[in-house]
Amino acid sequence: MSLTSALPSADMPRSMVWLFATASGLSVANVYYAQPLLDALANDFGISHAAVGGVVTATQIGCALALLLVVPLGDKVDRRRLMAVQLIALVVALVSVSMAQSSSALLIGMLATGMLGTAMTQGLIAYAASAASAHEQGRVVGAAQGGVFTGLLLARVFAGGISD
């Protein structure tokens, strides 16, 4: 048997690879939008400029909680269903952040956004790896991870443009 006959005949379509990369980038971007907006958030919520760093702290605590508690669920339950639930929860968290009237509501929303944005990102990368055939996993995971880096950087640029 030749090596070529052992390989699957259909590669993951480029559009699917781009979808994983884009979704990963958009998911992680939610975790980083607030950083350039801290001065505006301090003014809008009447928080001191020293205390507004709690927004980033809450988001990063959410990231850590996701890695410890939520991401491992992808090995135990159906990954597609888990990601669908996480997506709905992330949308709810983002809506709660956008409608926050108090600093405590903002912090809780950012904690949830950090947790769900991180969990979605990691889940998408793992799902991309499992959906790709063995010979293209590196390319697919690399594209998804590239989407993460691009989303992280562009989120800060976009939010920085809004804050100016």
Give the location of each predicted region:
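Extracytoplasmic
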Residues: 22-49, 67
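Interfacial helix-cap and linker-helix signal at transmembrane-aqueous boundaries
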Residues: 41-42, 73-74, 158-164
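Paired small-residue
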Residues: 93, 104-112
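Conserved MFS/SLC helix-loop-helix module at the cytosolic interface between two early adjacent transmembrane helices
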Residues: 65-101
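Small-residue-rich transmembrane alpha-helices and their cytosolic helix-loop interfaces
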Residues: 24, 56, 60, 87, ...
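Helix-loop-helix hairpin linking two adjacent transmembrane segments in secondary transporters
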Residues: 103-105, 143-164
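Residue-level signature of mid-helix packing/kink "hotspots" within the transmembrane helices
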Residues: 32, 60-68, 152-153
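Cytoplasmic helix-loop-helix junction between adjacent transmembrane helices
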Residues: 109-147
